[in-house]
Amino acid sequence: PQKAVLGLDLICVFEKEEQVRKMQPDQTLLKEIEGRIQNATAAGINVDCVSRSFCPKLSIAEDPVCGSAHCQIAAYWSRVLNKPAIKAYQASRRGGYLYLELLDKGRIKISGEAVLVAVADIKAKL
């Protein structure tokens, strides 16, 4: 990477979108790197940024579209691009677009499309 930024998660910034799309990291080695999630990102061609989120420490090889990781990714690209709203694409096998908006008091609004995977009722004795 050209640059690395460590917060709760690690962001590795690459020069080209294609580097992010084609990478095949060693999951065992990723467990030894700082950060809860290891993210790869680059400026995008058709979006503001592309990313991938690898989470072997959480027993997830790659998160298809990671909302929590994009809190830090959005803050980074907003600062770099001097834009309050960012359009991102997570380039996992499933992939997905995220629309990220920096709000007041360090909050970030994340929106995009989702897939319903379950519907359930939870009953609890109070």
List each model region and its residues.
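Active-site proximal loop and beta-alpha junction motif in alpha/beta enzyme cores
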Residues: 1-126
